UniProtKB/Swiss-Prot annotation:
<feature type="binding site">
    <location>
        <position position="11"/>
    </location>
    <ligand>
        <name>Zn(2+)</name>
    </ligand>
</feature>
<comment type="function">
    <text>DNA-dependent RNA polymerase (RNAP) catalyzes the transcription of DNA into RNA using the four ribonucleoside triphosphates as substrates.</text>
</comment>
<protein>
    <recommendedName>
        <fullName>DNA-directed RNA polymerase subunit Rpo12</fullName>
        <ecNumber>2.7.7.6</ecNumber>
    </recommendedName>
</protein>
<dbReference type="InterPro" id="IPR029040">
    <property type="entry name" value="RPABC4/Spt4"/>
</dbReference>
<feature type="binding site">
    <location>
        <position position="30"/>
    </location>
    <ligand>
        <name>Zn(2+)</name>
    </ligand>
</feature>
<feature type="binding site">
    <location>
        <position position="27"/>
    </location>
    <ligand>
        <name>Zn(2+)</name>
    </ligand>
</feature>
<dbReference type="GO" id="GO:0005694">
    <property type="term" value="C:chromosome"/>
</dbReference>
<dbReference type="GO" id="GO:0005737">
    <property type="term" value="C:cytoplasm"/>
</dbReference>
<keyword id="KW-0862">Zinc</keyword>
<keyword id="KW-0479">Metal-binding</keyword>
<dbReference type="Pfam" id="PF03604">
    <property type="entry name" value="Zn_ribbon_RPAB4"/>
</dbReference>
<keyword id="KW-0548">Nucleotidyltransferase</keyword>
<dbReference type="GO" id="GO:0003899">
    <property type="term" value="F:DNA-directed RNA polymerase activity"/>
</dbReference>
<dbReference type="InterPro" id="IPR006591">
    <property type="entry name" value="RNAP_P/RPABC4"/>
</dbReference>
<dbReference type="InterPro" id="IPR023464">
    <property type="entry name" value="Rpo12"/>
</dbReference>
<dbReference type="GO" id="GO:0008270">
    <property type="term" value="F:zinc ion binding"/>
</dbReference>
<keyword id="KW-0808">Transferase</keyword>
Amino acid sequence: MATAVYRCAKCGKEVELDLATAREVRCPYCGSKILYKPRPRVARRVKAI
């Protein structure tokens, strides 16, 4: 049972989905099919040349 947290592109709410048993991937709040995985807020250091 692999649950993953996604964010809805339309309403912005976080949705937890079980991808093993989910028949369709939709936001339960607004019905949008566009969900994306939120990126962690980690600052990355880039070495200057």
